[in-house]
Regions:
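A short, conserved structural fragment
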Residues: 124-134
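Hydrophobic alpha-helical packing residues
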Residues: 6-10, 123, 149
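Short amphipathic alpha-helical interaction segments
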Residues: 110-125
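Minor-groove-contacting beta-hairpin "wing" of winged helix-turn-helix DNA-binding domains
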Residues: 135-139
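Short, amphipathic alpha-helical interaction segments positioned at domain boundaries
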Residues: 141-176
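C-terminal scaffold of the Radical SAM
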Residues: 1-111, 161, 171-176
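Non-catalytic, well-ordered alpha-helical scaffold segments
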Residues: 84-91, 117, 143, 147
Length: 176
C-alpha cells in the first residue's frame, strides 16, 4: 500500500518511474542504472569490481592485497555459453517501465516470444502487466510481485528450451 501510494505521490509531483524502485524527473533517469537494465557492456576497475565486456562477465578479487599483487586477479567469470542471457533480458527488462521488447527478444535470442504471451495475458487480467507498443511491461501492482512473475517466466523459457532441444534431438529443426 505504501509503495503504490509513493508511486502516485511521485507521479503527481512530476516524477516518472523508470525502474522498479527508481523515479526521476523527465530526462534525468540514471544512465548508470539503465546501463545494467538494458544489458549494455560495462567495465569495472579495482578490487571487487565487475565487468561485462565482449560476451564475458567477470569480477576482480575483493582482497586489495591480492589485487595489488596482480596474481589471480579474477575471482569469477562467465561466458556467453554459461550465461542465460534470454532470461536475464526478461528479468532486467521487467524491472524497467519500458518492459520487454518482443521483436528484440526474438531477434537477439533466436526464439519465439509467443509462449510467454499466454502468461502475460493472465497477468494483464490480474492487473499486473499491460501491453506496450513493443511488448509487455509490469504495472505498479506487478512490480510488487515481480519476483513471482519472473520465476514463472523463467520456467516458461526453460520449458521452451527443453522442447527445442527435444525436437532437435529427434531431427525436427522447425522453430519451436
Amino acid at each position: 500500500e505504501m509503495y503504490l501510494s509513493a508511486v502516485d505521490t511521485l507521479a503527481q509531483h512530476g516524477y516518472e518511474q523508470y525502474e522498479i524502485s527508481n523515479f526521476a524527473r523527465p530526462g534525468f533517469a540514471s544512465r548508470h542504472n539503465l546501463k545494467y537494465w538494458h544489458m549494455d557492456e560495462y567495465a569495472g576497475f579495482g578490487p571487487g569490481a565487475h565487468s561485462d565486456l565482449g560476451g564475458v562477465r567477470f569480477a576482480y578479487v575483493r582482497d586489495i592485497d591480492r589485487y595489488i599483487a596482480g596474481q589471480l586477479l579474477l575471482s569469477e567469470s562467465e561466458t556467453e555459453e554459461t550465461l542465460a542471457r534470454d532470461f536475464e533480458y526478461v528479468m532486467l527488462s521487467l524491472r524497467t517501465a519500458e518492459g520487454i521488447d518482443r521483436a528484440y527478444f526474438e531477434r537477439t535470442y533466436r526464439q519465439r516470444f509467443a509462449p510467454l504471451d499466454g502468461l502475460f495475458r493472465q497477468y494483464e487480467t490480474a492487473g499486473l502487466a499491460q501491453p506496450t507498443e513493443k511488448g509487455w511491461r509490469l504495472t505498479p501492482q506487478g512490480f510488487l510481485v515481480s519476483n513471482s512473475i519472473i520465476v514463472a517466466l523463467e520456467d516458461a523459457l526453460a520449458a521452451q528450451k527443453l522442447q527445442r532441444q527435444t525436437a532437435a534431438a529427434s531431427g525436427d529443426y522447425r522453430i519451436v
